[in-house]
Structures are given as C-alpha cells and as structure tokens.
Amino acid sequence: MKKPIITFNNFSFQYHSQSEPTLKGIQLTIYEGEKVLIVGPSGSGKSTLAQCINGLIPNIYEGEIQGTATVAGKNIQETSLFDLSFDVGTVLQDTDGQFIGLTVAEDIAFALENDAVEQAEMKKAVQKWSEIVELNQLLQHRPQDLSGGQKQRVSMAGVLINQSKILLFDEPLANLDPRAGQETMTLIDTIQQETKATVLIIEHRLEDVLCESVDRIIVMNEGTIISDTTPDELLRQDTLTQQGIREPLYVTAMKYAGIDLTQVSHLDKLAEVSGETVLPKMTQWSVQPSSVSAVKGAELLRLEQVSYQYDRHGEKVLDDFSVTIHHGEMISIVGKNGAGKSTLSKIICGFITPQSGKILWEGQDFSNYSIKERADKIGYVMQNPNQMISKKMIFEEVALGLVLRDVPQAEIEERVTNILHICGLYPFRNWPISALSFGQKKRVTIASILVLEPELLILDEPTAGQDFKHYTEMMTFLEELNRLGVTILMITHDMHLMLEYTTRALVVCDGRLLADATPVAVLTDEKLIQAASLKETSLFTFAKALGLENPLLFTEKFVAYDREVRFG
C-alpha cells in the first residue's frame, strides 16, 4: 500500500497583504509515486498550493496559516526552505530565471557542488541525467543559447540530479512549440517511471498534458478543491466547462454529437476511446459542412523573395520569403522556435532591414518608410506587456503615442476615451497599471497601439500564460477588432487558437514559408506537422482512431459548428 507523501488537513492560508484567504479548508492527500495534474483558472490557488508544497510558503511568502500541511513527513511550518529543497524539486515556468551555471554541465551540477560532492561522482551524475534528458551533446553550451525545450531540459536535469522525492512542474508547456510540448510530457513520464518520484504538474493546457497518462486531476477554484478524481471520470462530468477550463476538443465533439459520455470507455486516452454509440453518432454528425468561401479584401501587404541574416556569414533566418496579406484577414503564423517568425514581424515593422527582396504596402514600395511612418500603419504587441508599458496610469499609457505625435489635447481625450470603451478598459481609465491582471495589461498595450489607428496589428503570443476564461476574453476581443476592419497577424504556438479563431495559417520553417493554407489543412497534414514541429489536432486523431470515413471533413465540420455555437 502506497504511503502519503503530501497531506493537507483543513488547511487555509491568507497572505498578510490580503483581506481573505487564498486557500480555504484544503483537504488533500497525495501518495508516493503518483502523477497528479492541478488545473484551475487564474487566481484559483494553484500556485499558492504549490508554494506550500515546495516551502516558499511560509519561508519566503508569509501569512496566516490554519490547519496543517506535511511534505515528506515534515510539517511545513516547522521546516526550513533548505531542508524541504531536498524533498521537492521545482521546475519553473520561466527557465531563464532558474539558470546558475555558465554551461549546461555547470548548471546541472550546481546542487551537487553545493553539497561538496566529489568531482568524479559529480561528473558521473551529470552524464547520467544529461543522457536521460537528451542533453549529453550540449554540455559545454551556454543554457541561454538553447531552444525553449532544451532550456527546460537543463532545468529538469538540475532538479533531477538531486534525486528529490517530489517533482513539481509549474506550467511546463507555456513557452514551448507543440512538438516540444509533447516531447516534454513524454520526458516527464519517462522520468517518473525511472525515478518513481511523485510528480505534480500545474498546467492550463489539459489536453496536451493528457497525451501521457496521469493518475489524478485536481480542479481548483477560488481557493478550494472543486474536484479530485481520475481523468476518465472528470471528462465525463461538466466540471471543467463550469469552472472555465478548456476540455479536450474531441470530448466537445462527442457532446456536440449527442453522445452519452457515461457510456464511453477510456475517455482520457484519445486513441482508445470506445463505446457502442460513438462511431455511428459521430458518423451521422460529421456530414460535410456547407461552407461559403470568404471573399478576400484588397491587397494590404506583400513580401517578395525577402531574405535576412543576422550575421553576414551566418545562415539565413528568412530565405526567399514571399507572402501576400489582404485587408481584413485574421492569420496565424506558426512554426517551431527559431523558425523565423519573430524576424518576419521585425522586418514588416521596419525594426530590421532585409538584405534582399521587396516589401510592398498597398502596392507601394515600403522600404523607404521610416519606423515612425510604418508605426502609423502597423501596430506590434509584444508577448510580455510589462516590456511595453512606460507610464503608471492607464489613460496616460494609452495616450502616450498621441502625445509624442503632438496631437491636440482635445483630440487625444476623444480618441483615448473611444479606444478605452472598445477595449473594455474605460471603467479602469484612472487606475494604476500595477493594479491590473496580466490579461488587462495586455489590453492596455493593445489599446495604446489601436489609438494610433493602425491598419495591421501584429501580436506575439497574445494568449500565452492565460487561463481559458481570459484566453476566450482576449480572442473574442481580437475578433471584434477584426470585424471593425483591423487586419490581424498572430504569432502563436497555440494550435487551438489557430484552429478556432483564424481562417489562414502561415507555416514558417527554417526561414521559409512551408505552407499557406487553412488551419484545418495544416493540422491534418502529417508531413507538414513533422517538418514544422506542430501537433496533429486531437479531432483528426480521434476521427482516424474511430475509423470515420473522412477525418478531414469531420475536423472542418467541428471547427465550423464550434464557431457557430460560440459566436452565433
């Protein structure tokens, strides 16, 4: 019989700076060797629970505690952060903030250096764990020079080398491309089988986590545990949608088809879903949708054979890249990390100049436009809003671009007020920006661009790190902007966003435009998925596993029907 390794008994925690508890009456037992997924909307208490487990609460973040919590048999109120660190290893969402060493090898060895382990033993351990996480060929590289997935593996190895009993992963998929995310979940599964450690995963992307099995899913909201059950049982219920958490798309498809999920087996295992009514009902539902071809607007932006390299003797980051963007389109730009997506946006904005090729704006040569002149036509919103914000107050921040352009004060007041209404920020117009959530700050940065009345808006990962509720709010807001005539390009790793909200996808790979097609066509093309480090949509995988006659048409049907359900 497995022993408890983490227990919370009627546990509540309230930060000193807050008027109400963040965790309320938590009753929870996690056993040795379990793999547990913790999900919930932003502010649900997930991170606070994790900080109680790894000792940051109460050692770093102080507050009032009621009840008891023990980790590896130690009361967290009586145990130092140092002592708990031997039992709990944490891999942070921001891996750059976790690096210590100048090389991968040094970073992995850091914990052993602190423990004064003999060098021969240390080298042996570094070699062992670097092989497990497939970094043994990169030991002399700087961690900062690696891809997002490789950086995460460095952090994993640095934690694993300490042989902690409990491994805590904080949003391990947040900054990874789809294939790297899938590889990360497989690696976590391999590590758990190898070490028999207890694994806790905090993550928004439920469907992506379930590509490997988990023992339990804990659903949190408003500081309490709403549900604690197996994945199979949870997916039969409406708990996820009630709590504003995205359920797997194939589960939504079965609901649309009127399938009784209580009669479905292996609901948490995509390739093994079965039930007497599943195939006939899905077949009946998946008739080809009647679709009206969208009429393209006039040409807005055209790139002709554009090439760029950062180093004169280095590889081309963009190579003979050609594409045409039309007025009113909403397009996703996808591809693995380092594919050239960000370079493409920098060239369009004029931050860097290509060595060859043409850029045309409404048929006119764009190369002679200054950055300021381009900024009047193109808005660029960075992934992290904190890197764009200059002022303390919302109204001042949104007005800044107009002030710098010497726009008359009366016109500034009128335009800023109008944009704040459009962005849903008017009630907060006199608030300090520091009081806003991450998603609200993102809206402020978008508002500060929109007030300049650009025709094209480029967003880098517009929904990164947001729960499903805030994700939906952001994407609904962007759709409304698109309906107002703003052309939108989104750089994203989120295949759901690409599938559900855009009608065209540009796939970038090694600096080239690998494909320009509908999102459904992209995410059902096996060769394209492999080449660009994408991930086949679960809808297509589900349809193939069921044996539906035309999985592609089924996927198209779902996307069209789902849009109709959500937007009418």
Swiss-Prot record:
Gene3D superfamilies: P-loop containing nucleotide triphosphate hydrolases (3.40.50.300). It is found in: Cell membrane. ATP 2 binds at G335, K336, N337, G338, A339, G340, K341, S342. Residues 6-247, 301-535 form the ABC transporter domain. The keyword Methyltransferase does not apply. InterPro entries: AAA+_ATPase, ABC_Co_transporter, ABC_transporter-like_ATP-bd, ABC_transporter-like_CS, ABC_transpr_CbiO/EcfA_su, ECF_ABC_transporter_ATP-bd, P-loop_NTPase. It is an enzyme of class 7 (translocase). It comes from the Bacteria. Keywords: ATP-binding, Cell membrane, Membrane, Nucleotide-binding, Repeat, Translocase, Transport. Its EC number is 7.-.-.-. ATP 1 binds at G40, P41, S42, G43, S44, G45, K46, S47. GO terms for molecular function: ATP binding; ATP hydrolysis activity; ATPase-coupled transmembrane transporter activity. It is a peripheral membrane protein. PROSITE patterns: ABC_TRANSPORTER_1, ABC_TRANSPORTER_2. GO terms for cellular component: ATP-binding cassette (ABC) transporter complex. Belongs to the ABC transporter superfamily. Probably part of an ABC transporter complex. Responsible for energy coupling to the transport system. PANTHER family: ABC TRANSPORTER ATP-BINDING PROTEIN BC_2655-RELATED, HEAVY METAL TRANSPORTER. This is Putative ABC transporter ATP-binding protein EF_2153. The lineage of its organism: Bacteria, Bacillati, Bacillota, Bacilli, Lactobacillales.
